[in-house]
C-alpha cells in the first residue's frame, strides 16, 4: 500500500473545492478561544472544518523554527497551532464515460465550502494558507502562500531562473504565466 490507510478515501478523489488556513496559537488562548469556537461552529454550519494540529509549528523548538525560517514556507506557520482544512470532493474521472462528476453537486459543494472558508478567513486576517493544500483560485496567492518571504523568493527566482523555465500555477514568479482565458472573471476555471 502506498498511502496511509486513514486517508484511503482521498485516493483518486475529484476535488470540487479546497481551502486551508493557518490558525494562530493566540486564537486558542484566553478570551480569543471563545470567539474561535464560535467562528468554527458558524463555519461548520456551511461545511465540515478539519483542524490539523500536526502541520503547524507554534511551540516547536527554537532550533526547528530557525531551520524552518530558512525555507520558503510562509512564516505564518510558526505562529500557527493548527491548519484548518475545508474541502469537498467526490468520485469521478473526468473524461471517462460513465464516471463524470455530478456538476450540480460539485457546484453546490464548492459554494458551501467557499462560504465556510470565508468565515474562517475573516476571523484570521493575515494568517495565510498552506500552499500544498489550498484554493487553486486564490487571488492573493503571493501573500497567502508565501507571506513575507515572497519578495526574497522572487529575487532568488530571478537570479537562478531569469527566463521562468521552471514554473507552475501560483509558484513564485508565475505571475502572467497562466493564460488569462483559463480563468473566468469570477476567478473560476472555465
Give residue spans per PLM region:
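Soluble FAD-dependent oxygen oxidases
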Residues: 1-190
Amino acid at each position: 500500500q502506498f498511502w496511509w490507510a486513514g486517508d484511503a478515501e482521498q485516493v483518486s478523489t475529484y476535488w470540487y473545492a479546497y481551502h486551508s488556513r493557518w490558525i494562530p496559537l493566540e486564537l486558542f488562548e484566553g478570551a480569543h478561544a471563545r470567539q474561535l469556537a464560535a467562528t468554527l461552529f458558524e463555519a461548520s454550519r456551511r461545511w465540515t472544518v478539519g483542524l490539523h494540529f500536526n502541520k503547524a509549528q507554534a511551540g516547536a523548538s527554537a532550533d526547528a523554527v530557525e531551520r524552518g525560517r530558512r525555507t520558503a514556507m510562509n512564516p505564518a506557520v510558526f505562529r500557527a497551532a493548527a491548519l484548518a482544512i475545508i474541502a469537498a470532493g467526490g468520485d469521478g474521472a473526468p473524461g471517462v464515460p460513465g464516471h463524470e462528476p455530478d456538476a450540480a453537486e460539485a457546484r453546490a459543494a464548492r459554494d458551501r465550502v467557499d462560504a465556510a472558508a470565508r468565515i474562517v478567513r475573516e476571523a484570521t486576517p493575515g494568517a495565510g494558507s498552506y500552499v500544498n493544500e489550498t484554493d487553486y483560485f486564490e487571488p492573493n496567492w503571493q501573500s497567502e502562500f508565501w507571506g513575507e518571504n515572497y519578495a526574497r523568493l522572487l529575487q532568488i527566482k530571478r537570479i537562478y531562473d531569469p527566463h521562468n523555465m521552471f514554473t507552475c500555477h501560483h509558484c513564485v514568479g508565475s505571475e502572467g504565466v497562466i493564460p488569462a482565458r483559463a480563468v473566468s472573471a469570477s476567478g473560476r476555471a472555465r
